[in-house]
C-alpha cells in the first residue's frame, strides 16, 4: 500500500516564509487575499535557517523559486550532526547546474520531469526525495554571492516513527573543469559503511570539437572491487539512452528526453544539431527501482571520451546516497 492510503499517527508540518517556525496554525494571520511574508531575504554572506525541528520525522517535499542560482548553498543536518549530510549549490541539487540560463537551445524552458525532482517553468524547483531523521533536522541556505537575494520556499514533512534500519539521505557536489584528459571522472568515492547509491545528476560542458562526446564508460565498484561489478559501455547507455542520444543516427542530431528515473533533459548553446558543436548538457539517473547496494563501500567513475579518443570537457555532478 502507498503511504497516502495508510492511516497513521504522523503529524504534517510545513516551513515557509509565511510560517518560518513550521508550527501548527502558524501561517499568515492576514486573512484572505493577503500576502504578508511571501519571501525570505538573504543578505550577501548570510546563512538563514529554513527548517529547525525535532524528530523523529521525515522531509517529504521541497519547493524553491526566486533566486535559485549557484551562489545559494543548501545544507541539511540530521540528528544534530556537526557536518551536513547535504551540501551543494541549490541549482546543482535540483539538476540544473547551469543556472545562468534556464532556456534551452530551442528557446524553450528546459523542464526536468522525474519522480524525484521537478524543474518547472519559471524556475520552480521541486524535490521529492524522502529524508528521514530520528532526533533533529536542520536545513540552512547560505548566500555566497555579492548581492542580497530573495527566496520563496516551502518545505513539508511529517513527524512520524522512523525504523532503526532506515538510511540517512546524503547528497554531495563534485566538479572537474576540465576533466584531466585520459583520466576517468570520479562521480563518487570515499563512501564507507553499508548503504545504497540512489542517483546522480550530471552537467557536461564541451571543450573541444571531437565528434560525439558520450563514448565514456560508467563503472561501479562495490565494496572492495578491484574491477567494476557494474559496467556500462557508454555515457548515454548509463543515462538510459542509446546511440549518442540521437533521434536520427544518419544526421547525428540530439533529442532531449525526461523520464521517471532518467533523462537528458536540456541542451544549452546554439541550435546547430551536429555532434561536434560546443554545447552543454544536463542529465540525470535515479536508482529508485534499482538501488545499488553496498556493504563496506562504493565508488563510481565515468570516462570522458569521444569517438576518436579521450576528451577534456567540464563535468559537474550531484550524487545521492542513502546510508
Q: What do these predicted regions represent?
A:
Residues 1-117, 121:
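An N-terminus-focused feature that recognizes amino-terminal "leader" regions
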Residues 43-68, 123-125, 129, 146-149, ...:
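Surface-exposed interaction/gating patches
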Residues 77-81, 86-87, 219-226, 303:
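Short strand-turn-strand beta-turns centered on an Asx-Gly dipeptide
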Residues 105-135, 263-295, 305:
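Beta-sandwich interaction modules
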Residues 141-143:
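Asparagine-centered strand-capping/turn motif at beta-strand->loop junctions
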Residues 147-155, 310-318:
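Edge beta-strands of jelly-roll/beta-sandwich modules across compartments, strongly enriched
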Residues 300:
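Hydrophobic, well-ordered secondary-structure elements that form the walls
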Residues 320-323:
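Conserved small/polar residues in nucleotide/adenosyl-binding loops
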Amino acid at each position: 500500500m502507498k503511504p497516502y492510503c495508510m492511516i497513521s499517527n504522523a503529524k504534517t508540518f510545513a516551513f515557509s516564509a509565511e510560517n518560518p517556525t513550521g508550527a501548527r496554525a502558524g501561517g499568515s494571520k492576514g486573512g484572505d487575499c493577503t500576502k504578508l511574508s511571501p519571501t525570505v531575504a538573504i543578505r550577501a554572506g548570510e546563512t538563514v535557517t529554513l527548517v529547525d525541528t525535532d524528530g523523529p520525522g521525515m522531509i517529504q517535499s521541497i519547493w524553491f523559486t526566486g533566486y535559485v542560482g549557484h551562489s545559494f548553498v543548501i545544507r541539511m543536518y540530521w540528528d544534530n550532526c556537526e557536518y551536513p549530510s547535504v551540501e551543494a549549490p541549490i541549482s546543482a541539487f535540483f539538476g540544473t547546474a547551469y543556472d545562468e540560463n534556464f532556456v534551452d537551445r530551442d528557446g524553450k524552458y528546459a523542464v526536468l520531469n522525474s519522480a524525484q525532482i521537478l524543474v518547472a517553468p519559471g524556475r520552480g524547483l521541486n524535490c521529492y526525495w524522502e529524508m528521514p531523521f530520528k532526533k533533529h533536522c536542520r536545513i540552512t541556505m547560505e548566500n555566497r554571492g555579492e548581492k542580497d537575494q530573495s527566496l520563496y520556499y516551502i518545505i513539508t514533512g511529517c513527524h512520524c516513527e522512523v525504523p532503526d534500519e532506515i538510511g540517512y539521505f546524503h547528497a554531495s557536489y563534485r566538479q572537474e573543469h576540465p576533466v584531466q584528459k585520459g583520466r576517468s571522472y570520479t562521480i563518487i568515492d570515499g563512501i564507507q559503511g553499508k548503504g545504497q547509491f540512489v542517483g546522480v545528476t550530471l552537467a557536461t560542458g564541451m571543450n573541444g570539437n571531437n565528434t560525439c562526446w558520450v563514448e565514456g564508460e560508467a563503472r561501479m565498484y562495490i565494496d572492495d572491487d578491484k574491477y567494476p561489478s557494474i559496467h556500462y559501455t557508454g555515457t548515454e547507455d548509463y543515462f538510459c539512452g542509446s546511440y549518442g542520444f540521437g533521434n536520427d543516427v544518419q544526421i547525428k542530431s540530439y533529442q532531449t528526453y525526461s523520464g521517471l528515473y532518467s533523462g537528458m533533459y536540456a541542451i544549452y548553446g546554439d541550435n546547430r544539431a551536429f555532434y561536434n558543436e560546443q554545447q552543454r548538457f544536463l542529465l540525470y539517473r535515479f536508482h529508485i527501482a534499482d538501488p545499488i547496494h553496498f556493504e563496506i563501500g562504493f565508488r563510481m567513475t565515468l570516462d570522458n571520451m569521444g569517438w576518436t579518443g579521450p576528451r577534456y570537457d567540464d563535468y559537474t555532478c550531484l550524487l545521492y546516497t542513502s546510508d
